[in-house]
Swiss-Prot record:
GO terms for molecular function: L-malate dehydrogenase (NAD+) activity. Transmembrane segments: none annotated. Belongs to the LDH/MDH superfamily. MDH type 1 family. This is Malate dehydrogenase. The active site is at H177 (proton acceptor). One of its GO terms (biological process) is tricarboxylic acid cycle. Catalyzes the reversible oxidation of malate to oxaloacetate. Substrate binds at R81, R87, N119, R153. The gene is mdh. It comes from the Bacteria.
Length: 317
C-alpha cells in the first residue's frame, strides 16, 4: 500500500512528510513529490528515522513516478496565505496547481483516494471533481477536502474555555473550510461523553474564534507564513485514519465531500463520514442543530454554493 504526498517540500508538506513517516502502518510506501529540487533530499532525511515506512522523493514538473501505484494521494501543493489574503485570494494560483496535479492522478492512479489540504478547499475540491469527471474516473467515494484542522481547533479552544482535558472533548464541525462557512456545533459538544453547556456569549465568541483561527495564525506570524504545523498535524491525523480505513479499520472523520442528492446541503459539504475499504462508505447524520446553528447554516449555504460554482466554472468556463 502506498501514500503519495504532493507538495512535500512546502511549509505543510515537510512536516506532514515527517509525521507520515512516523505514523503510517508498518510496510507502507511513502512517495514525496514537489516541483522543488530539494524533495529527494527531504526523503533521504526522513528515511534515516527508524520506522518501517519507506520514503522516496521525486522532483520536477511531472509527478507520475510518485503517483504510480498510490492508494491515497494527499495534496498540499500551492502557495500559503499571507497577511491581508483570504483563502479565496489564493484561488487564482492554487486552482491551476491542483487542476494539473489531479489531471495526473486521473491518468496514473485513477482509483486512488484523494485528500485535498491546499486552500481554498471549498473551491478546489469541486475543481478536482470536475477534472476527474472529464477524465471519466470520478468516484465521489474517493475525493475529500481535509477539514480536520477545524475540528482540532474546536476541540482545543473548547477544552481551554471549559477547562476540560482536551482528549475528552468532542466538537462536531460541519460546512466548509473558510471563515463563515465553518460551523462548529457547540450544542453537540461533549466532554467524557457528557454535554457541555455554554452561554450565548460564549457560543458566539467561540464560533468566531474557530472560524477565524487561520487569520489568528497569519497575523501572529507577522508576515512569516500561515498555519503550517497545526495543519500538518491535522493532515496526518486524517491521512493515517483514512489509510487505515482502506486497510479495513473502522474510521469516522469529518471531511468535505459530495453530499447526498436532495439532502438540502450544498453539493459539497463537511459531514461526519464513515470511511472504509473504498473510501467514503457512509455520510452519517449531522444531528439536531440549535436555532443559532440553523441560522448560521442558512447563512453559510449561499457562500459555500458560490465557492463551489467558482470551482466548477474554472474547469468548465
Amino acid at each position: 500500500m502506498k501514500v503519495a504526498l504532493l507538495g512535500a517540500a512546502g511549509g505543510i508538506g515537510q512536516t506532514l512528510a515527517l509525521l507520515l513517516k512516523l505514523r503510517l502502518p508498518v510496510g507502507t510506501d511513502l512517495a514525496l513529490y514537489d516541483i522543488s529540487p530539494v524533495t529527494p533530499g527531504i526523503a533521504v532525511d526522513i528515511s534515516h528515522i527508524p520506522t518501517s515506512v519507506s520514503a522516496v522523493g521525486y522532483s520536477g514538473e511531472d509527478p507520475s513516478e510518485a503517483l504510480k501505484g498510490a492508494n491515497l494521494v494527499i495534496i498540499t501543493a500551492g502557495v500559503a496565505r499571507k497577511p491581508g489574503m483570504t483563502r479565496a485570494d489564493l484561488f487564482n494560483i492554487n486552482a491551476d496547481i491542483v487542476k494539473n496535479l489531479v489531471e495526473k492522478v486521473a491518468e496514473v492512479c485513477p482509483k486512488a483516494c484523494i485528500g485535498i489540504v491546499t486552500n481554498p478547499v471549498n473551491t478546489l475540491v469541486p475543481i478536482a471533481a470536475e477534472v476527474l469527471r472529464k477524465a471519466g474516473v470520478y468516484d465521489k467515494r474517493k475525493l475529500f477536502g481535509v477539514t480536520t484542522l477545524d475540528v482540532v481547533r474546536a476541540k482545543t479552544f473548547t477544552s481551554e474555555l471549559k477547562e476540560k482535558h482536551v482528549e475528552t472533548v468532542k466538537v462536531p464541525v460541519i460546512g466548509g473550510h473558510s471563515g463563515p462557512t465553518i460551523l462548529p456545533l457547540l450544542s453537540q459538544a461533549l466532554s467524557e461523553g457528557l454535554p457541555l453547556s455554554f452561554t450565548q456569549e460564549e457560543i458566539e465568541a467561540l464560533t468566531y474564534r474557530i472560524q477565524n483561527a487561520g487569520t489568528e495564525v497569519v497575523e501572529a506570524k507577522a508576515g512569516g507564513g500561515s498555519a503550517t504545523l497545526s495543519m500538518a498535524e491535522s493532515g496526518a491525523r486524517f491521512a493515517v485514519a483514512v489509510f487505515k480505513a482502506l486497510l479495513g479499520e473502522d474510521c469516522v472523520r469529518y471531511a468535505y465531500v459530495e453530499s447526498k442528492e436532495g439532502s438540502g446541503y450544498p453539493e459539497f459539504f463537511a459531514h461526519p463520514v464513515r470511511f472504509g475499504l473504498t473510501g467514503v462508505e457512509e455520510l452519517l447524520p449531522i444531528g439536531k442543530l440549535s436555532e443559532y446553528e440553523q441560522a448560521k447554516l442558512d447563512e453559510l449555504k449561499p457562500v459555500l454554493e458560490a465557492d463551489i460554482a467558482l470551482g466548477k466554472n474554472f474547469v468548465n468556463p
